[in-house]
Amino acid sequence: MVRELYENAVRGIDTRQNLSALRSAVKDDAGMNDLFELVEDDLGTMTGFLDSDDPKVRKNAALLMGELDMSDFVQPLVNGYRKESQLFVRSAYLEALKGYDIEEYLPFFKGRVKELSDTEITPENRKHIDEEMKALTELIVSCEGISRHEFKGFKRFEADTEGILITNRLNMDTTRQQLEECGVKVLPFKGGVRFSTDNLTFLRDIRTYSDVLFVIPGCRTCEFEPEKAAAMLAGSGLMKLLYRLHGGENGQPFYFRVELKSTLDMEKKGKFVRRFSGELERQSKRMLINSASDYEIELRLIENKEHKLNILLKLYTIEDERFSYFVKHIAASIKPVNSALLVELAKEYMVSDAQVLDPFCGVGTMLIERQKAVKANTSYGLDISAEAVAGARLNTEAAGQIVHYINRDFFTFEHEYLFDEIFTDMPFAVNDKVTLELDNIYRRFFTCANRHLTMEGRIIMYSRNPQMAVKYSKNAGYRILKRIVISEKNNAELMIFEHEV
């Protein structure tokens, strides 16, 4: 099939259609190998398509030359780009050149960026200039990377910075309280924990938030139109905020990506983002450059109930080392931030210097987070998965802690002394067959817990099957001290038990 399509294109038989079909035919390795064999001894025929009078032939040929990954095509592609008169074709040459060594041509491509920046934008050329500028940026970045800014915001400033901590929606008060204890002003907000402060050092210490988004001064809400949104953002305090948090202005642009959260379908979202990004580059005089592959900041555009946009800033320049120990994980691993939340919620029921057991330890996250908040005497982790236990050992070493991990089933585990606490993330299931097995696990769990816990000991459990825990804990002689809903969607609760008196 590849040979027939190629030979027909060479003979001038439906050249445009055959080259287009070739692009589809070479998406798998076999098709690509067939085309490579046809072209490698006759490069001139392929490059000859770039001289066609049909712009779509030139476009398809350029893209095929990029996919073939033959270094001999670099010069013809650059020459083709230089002389290409059709705006909609120009970005195809640039796309084709990605992956090739184009270092010697960088001055030329950077000069072209300057030319496009100075070009008057009209409704007719806007789309194609934006496409070419985006392709040029990606090509240049793929060759030399970006000049990254260093976050220097962990210190006291004269002006306040406002932001939002993203945390568990049902337990936001836990994070609010920690902020207040750090002396940070907490502001009313429903979608997270909003703060205003002149010192961001608390971001390194509070462990119960998953993300931080910054409020952009002068740009809280804007019209849901790409050009208007870009103009408002460019005229806001965004650049001042970025400079303040990164040690001042150094002449280097910030590279950004856009995340649009909206009811628009994917096609309309993509169109909006492209128009917004291109306009923002122009309005900011390319001190903000859109890059899908390598970026430092994210502009998060969120459609609100009034069909306008709230714009927030996410910084990838912040090195979040709170969970740097989490180097190994498995599919069922609980996220460290969730473990940290469970610990914070249960902390008042934990005892310092306790003997602690996690019978379903996974990669050790629960025990590691507990130790960070409330020091244990000795901690043991059990799991039937050898892979999980190996991961737990690596994570615990990375955390600078000591935990005794054993690749063993909790229900056959024996130990010479009793534990003060069982702290665990219980197994869970998503289908009825495994649910029957889970019922048996919960029944056996509480029976075995009686063998391993002191009479004053407590069970602190994260469960997606709280009804099973209620049933079998009562049968085994436990009473519930506390239940905290973590996720209504997943029926997940933090549950704390102790022996009936």
Which stretches of residues belong to each language-model region?
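Residues at or immediately flanking beta-strands
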Residues: 255, 298, 402-404
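Non-catalytic nucleic-acid substrate-recognition regions in nucleic-acid-modifying enzymes
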Residues: 98, 114-126, 130-283
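Class I S-adenosyl-L-methionine-dependent methyltransferase catalytic core
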Residues: 2-187, 202, 304-309, 313-501
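Interaction modules related to DNA damage response and DNA replication/repair
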Residues: 286-297
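Short coil/turn motifs at beta-sheet boundaries
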Residues: 158, 251, 292-294, 490
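Short secondary-structure junctions
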Residues: 283-286, 477
